[in-house]
Structures are given as structure tokens and as C-alpha cells.
């Protein structure tokens, strides 16, 4: 083995050695040219006064980086690793740019610590939970990533049955699987950037609760760690975490006094709204159209967006015989945005249409109010680029993030923005907008460096088998 071999310890020659020959007394031992002893038979002994063992009195304190010092490192490193892991978990749910949202998350964490646990929602095809505060009031909806419709720990059996009985129709090949929680947060981000204010604030959050659907291994490990902490505290304190591991998912603020849109739309059909109130509904509806079209929501029916219809009465006049009724207020909340941001337009079995396109509100051309709000933004390339970068920062948090798939998602979104911009400029209606041929706008590849990006536009010719479903 030569001196440059990687198997030679760097500390091999740090201690001086003397060579005592067994051939004849007083014989000198030849040295190699580099000052080391040649390979003659004999006994190697330490020169008196050198370190004899790690931690001995004669050796004194070990210098940093020496083998004796390295022997003391693992325990310290493990404790530092545990502390770093605990600190990382505490910093998972930090939102310095949104203190109001951070306060709601903190309330949820305190409630879970007091065993006021999230409650699983019976509706839907995935594991989603009502999150409560310490008073037991619902404050948010949490959707873990691994309990999504196609997640490994989805507690609902409907998707498993669909996969078993009809595998050809299982999943949506236009979507990135198990990315619904990012889609929920991404829809909220787009809503904020465009000042639509119809999506309840949604962000990526880490939570742990006994009511979540965990694997048997995780539950056994959690019980074992708790038992070790109770019986042998010194051993239990070595664990990075005591309890179930936190789950990553979307955390959406719960909105009160809202009902399914289908309920109110039927009421409004039987009992038409006053002109001013109907105008409010139309303006709110157009915001929903803008959001759904840009993110290409593939799951927008009339049962997963909400309407709040508030008819306040004047409390001052309620004491009299006459009751003054104030003008009603209508607001829309766009929830269930987990099946958006496709990497291609639907072209297989189903078209996944926007069901609001069959409503009478969709036949009215876009108002000047929505044009003034949206057109200056989506017509600005810098704004669109900034939106893409914000979505990139959000989506790259996923462990399975794929840059190529993200580029395809952005290409679809650019095409949607292009169609929406042109439809608003041409004075079209939402119904005419969804009838526009789908477009994909990709970044053009160039071998020459340039300060500006160029794009290529392409139309999708292939149509899904069921164009109405």
C-alpha cells in the first residue's frame, strides 16, 4: 500500500515510533529515504512520553480533530441532530408574511396538544379533516398529502374500488399525482396575486394527530417511543420526536355562513334576485371564472364552490313596527382546488369541463370591472413571470418535485392566460371563453444566450373521448 492510498489513515504517522531490532544488540536500523523505518522484522514500541491511551492522565487533552477527540463526537452530534430536528419541526409552520394565518395555525396546534383533535370529513373521496380551536370551533380544513384521492393512506375505499374494478379510468393522466395539496395552495396564491379574494387563505402546513390515517408501523413506533420515555427516560430522550410524525398538507381557513352554490342557484332561479344583488353575483361569478380558467381546474361542479347570501336587517328599526332590510350581500368562496394545474389539457377519456359554463351567468360577456382588475396584470409579461416564480417556489417544496413536469404545468397556464386575455379584449363571455381551442405556450429552446425569453405557441388537436363529461 503506497503513501497516497486512500486506505492509509491520515493519523498513522502522527505518533513517533522506535524500532528495536531482534537481530543483534546495538545494530542500527536503516531508515527509508522519507525518514521512516524500513520493513525489517522486529517489534514496534511507543517512545516514552507519548500518548498511551485516550483519556489517560499522561496524554492530557486531545487536540481537536484527533482520533481521541473524534471518539467523543458522536454523542454530541446526535444530541445536536436531535435539537436541530426539533427546531426544524417548530419552524415548519412559520408564516412571517401572514401573521393572521400563522395565528390560526397556532390555535390548531394548541388544540391538538389539548386533545381537541381534527375530525375527519365524511364527504369526498380523500382524507380531509375539520381542524378546531381550543373551544371546539372549526377553524380550518386540513388535507394531508398521503391521504389524497390517489395517496397511499387514503382512508376512503371508493378510489381503491375504482382502481380495482376499472383501472383504465383510474386517475387523471393530465394531473401530477399526489400534488393536490400544492394545487390547493397554488390556487390561493393565484387568487392573492390577482386580487380576486374568493379563495379562503390556503398554505402548506405540517400537522400530527391521532385521528389522521397513519400506517401500522408509524403507530407502533410512536407507542414504543412513548413507552421508552416513561420507563427509561434516558433512552427516550434520545429520540428526535415522541409521537406520530407530522403530515404535510394543505391548510385552508374555514369560511362560515356559506352554502353549496347549487342550493342558492336553485333558490335564485325560483325567486329572482333584485337587480343590484344580481349584479353582485355576476361580478363574483366572473372572478370564479378567471380563477378556474387560469389554473385549469378539472373538478369544478356546482357543489364545490360556495355562496354566502346575507340579508341583514337594521337593528335600530327592528324595535318599530316597520323593519328596514338592508341591501343583501353576496360573496363566493372557491374551495376544493386540489385537482388543478394540469401538465396537459385533458385528452383521454374525460374532458373535465367547467360546470358553471351551463349557468345563465356564463352567457353574459365579461364586465368592465373584471377587465379593469385582471387585464393590466395578465397582459404584463413581468407579472406573469413573477407568478411563475412564486408557483415554482411553492411547488418545489414537494419531495417528488420534477422540473420538467412543472414546465408543462406552466405551459398550460400560459396558454390559459393567453386565451383569457384575448377573450376579454374581444368582449366575449365565459361560455365563449371555454369554447376557445386550448393552447400551450412553451419556452422556446435556443442555443444562443439571450436576456429575454421566447415562447412557442401550439394548439391541442386531440380531444377526449367524452367531450361533455
From Swiss-Prot:
GO terms for molecular function: 1-phosphatidylinositol 4-kinase activity; AP-3 adaptor complex binding; ATP binding. InterPro entries: Lsb6/PI4K2, PI3/4_kinase_cat_dom. Residues 296-304 are annotated as: Catalytic loop. Residues 1-30, 50-72 are annotated as: Disordered. Keywords: ATP-binding, Cell membrane, Cell projection, Cytoplasmic vesicle, Endosome, Golgi apparatus, Kinase, Lipid metabolism, Lipoprotein, Membrane, Mitochondrion, Nucleotide-binding, Palmitate, Phosphoprotein, Synapse, Synaptosome, Transferase. One of its GO terms (cellular component) is membrane raft. Belongs to the PI3/PI4-kinase family. Type II PI4K subfamily. This is Phosphatidylinositol 4-kinase type 2-alpha. It comes from Xenopus laevis.
